[in-house]
Regions:
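A generic structural signal for short hydrophobic patches within well-formed alpha-helices
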Residues: 9, 44, 121-122
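Acidic, PIN/NYN-like endoribonuclease modules and their adjacent C-terminal/linker elements
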Residues: 1, 103-132
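Short, conserved alpha-helical segments within structured domains
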Residues: 40-43, 82
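Histidine- and aromatic-rich ligand-binding microenvironments
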Residues: 5, 40, 95-96, 118-119, ...
Length: 132
């Protein structure tokens, strides 16, 4: 298995560098590509953040891109169920994808809640507000 950095994953959607995009395309269409590439939680979070901040993508487009990654057989995704739930929450909520994802992972690891000062994140059942 091979881990992928965020900038490699972004080249699936940003074709501005044709050489890099082609290299990623070749990599993912190799005969043994299925299940061979790791997308860890940090990469997924950076991917969503970069699409939002640098590429000014709307929330729905970011959620669609994340869904596409999560359903691609080439990728091994730790905490897949948590990632899928986080995309759903992100699509309908106000917090960032990374907020939902880290709280979903925390819950899967036994946490009852995740404390935050972020009122947007605290709108659902994953977070609790820490009063200052």
């Amino acid at each position: 298995m091979i881990g992928l950095d965020t900038n490699v994953v972004l080249r699936l959607f940003d074709l501005s560098d044709s050489k890099q995009s082609a290299a990623v395309g070749r990599l993912l269409t190799m005969p043994d590509a299925e299940g061979n590439f790791l997308l860890n939680p940090i990469v997924l979070s950076e991917f969503a953040w970069t699409l939002q901040r640098a590429y000014k993508q709307p929330r729905t487009a970011i959620a669609d891109h994340l869904d596409r990654l999560l359903q691609s057989p080439e990728f091994v995704i730790p905490f897949l169920d948590e990632a899928l739930d986080s995309v759903r929450r992100y699509r309908d909520g106000r917090a960032n994808f990374a907020d939902y994802f880290l709280a979903a992972i925390n819950r899967s690891l036994g946490c009852n809640s995740t404390l935050t000062f972020d009122e947007d994140a605290a709108e659902g059942d994953l977070f609790s507000i820490l009063k200052a």
